[in-house]
A protein has these predicted regions:
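Tandem CBS (Bateman) regulatory domains
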Residues: 1-10, 46-92, 100, 104-149
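Core beta-strand residues in small-molecule sensory/regulatory alpha/beta domains
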Residues: 38, 98-99
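Alpha-helical/coil-rich non-catalytic "connector" segments in signaling and regulatory proteins
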Residues: 3-4, 15-22, 31-34
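Short, small/polar residue-rich loop motifs at catalytic or cofactor-binding pockets
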Residues: 29-32, 90-92
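Short, basic/aromatic recognition patches
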Residues: 18-25, 79-84
Length: 152
């Protein structure tokens, strides 16, 4: 499963000329703390709710408070594990996705990524997890297979 498969279609990107009030309204509506800022299909920034709330003027432009340095993003072909790592390391609620040409194609919410990860791991399927603890020196795939098949 790749980043392109995880995109949440209902999260619109902000434009640099949007005001802070619109950004905060969208963050509240979509229950996210970050939103990408896109200009002519190019990712130009990322805004955080905390930065927006610190701004005294609700009619100020998003471009005045957006992060423009080291904007985190995922490539369309990146694996879901790489996307989850980005969420974890950067503390993001939304990850922008770019294609191979650097064109913005959408965003992934943390919630959507977690749902897809659970789907990938078959969390909803009935079954059980067996944990076998062995010394490293005693590790043998044949022994593990025999233990698993020998117990009903």
């Amino acid at each position: 499963m790749h980043a392109l498969d995880l995109i949440t279609p209902d999260i619109p990107p902000l434009r640099p000329h949007d005001d802070i009030k619109r950004a905060l309204d969208w963050m509240e509506e979509f229950k996210v703390m970050h939103l990408p800022v896109v200009n002519e299909k190019r990712l130009v920034g990322l805004v955080k709710d905390t930065d927006l709330m610190e701004c005294a003027d609700a009619h100020a432009l998003v471009s005045t408070v957006m992060e423009q340095v080291e904007i985190p993003f995922a490539r369309a072909g990146q694996h879901i594990y790489d996307v989850m790592k980005l969420f974890s390391e950067r503390g993001l609620s939304v990850v922008p996705v770019l294609d191979e040409m650097g064109v913005y194609v959408g965003s992934i919410t943390e919630h959507q990524a977690l749902l897809k990860l659970a789907e990938l791991a078959n969390v909803g399927e009935p079954g059980s997890i067996v944990i076998l603890e062995m010394n490293l020196i005693d590790y043998s795939l044949q022994l593990i297979s025999r233990i698993v098949e020998g117990n009903d």
